[in-house]
Structure formats: C-alpha cells, structure tokens
C-alpha cells in the first residue's frame, strides 16, 4: 500500500461560486420592461400578469409598472400592475 498519494491526485475539490439567486425587485417597487424580478432554480415563483419566464426560470417584467406578489392554487405568482398615469 502506498504511503504517498499519486502524482495527479488532488486534496478534495473546492466550493462552487455563489449564483446570486433570489428576489431582485420586491412588492410595490416600480420596474421597467425587461427588468429581472427573480433569479431562481426551478419555479419557486410563477409568472403572472405582464411577467415572462426565461430558460433558466428567471422571472422578468414584460411591461413597466409595480411589482405585486399573490397566491393562486398554492402557487406564488409575481404580477406587474401597470400604472394608469403612465398610459395616459
């Protein structure tokens, strides 16, 4: 049995880099179209009105307005409520 490790062996792997996941815009905050609302793995939050979902499950605003969180059928939804003043 060898008392030394092989030439190409390593002393354990290293920890991975943090992915900066989480809610980026909170309820009541004003956002512009295209702004990222939530970065997530899987659909912890689901897209609601005026919210899109990217390939990596990132939720983003499709229109400008205020962020609103709600629940429907045990799903947490993220909606964008448009301002009437902005449209006029």
Swiss-Prot record:
Record GO terms (molecular function): structural constituent of ribosome
Highest taxon, organism lineage: Bacteria
InterPro entries: Ribosomal_bL27 (IPR001684), Ribosomal_bL27_CS (IPR018261)
Bias type Polar residues, positions: 1-13
The keyword Ribosomal protein appears for this protein: yes
One GO CC annotation: cytosolic large ribosomal subunit
Alphabetic keyword roster: Ribonucleoprotein, Ribosomal protein
GTP-binding found in the keyword field: no
Disulfide bonds: none
Disordered: annotated span: 1-23
Single GO BP term: translation
HAMAP family given in the database record: Ribosomal_bL27
Similarity-based family: Belongs to the bacterial ribosomal protein bL27 family.
Protein name: Large ribosomal subunit protein bL27
Organism per entry: Corynebacterium urealyticum (strain ATCC 43042 / DSM 7109)
């Amino acid at each position: 049995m060898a008392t030394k490790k092989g030439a190409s062996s390593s002393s354990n792997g290293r920890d991975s880099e943090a992915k900066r996941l989480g809610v980026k815009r909170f309820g009541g905050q004003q956002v512009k179209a295209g702004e990222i609302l939530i970065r997530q793995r899987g659909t912890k939050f689901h897209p609601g009105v005026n919210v899109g979902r990217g390939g990596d499950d990132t939720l983003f605003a499709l229109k400008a307005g205020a962020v609103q969180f709600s629940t429907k059928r045990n799903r947490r939804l993220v909606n964008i409520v448009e301002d009437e003043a902005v449209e006029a």
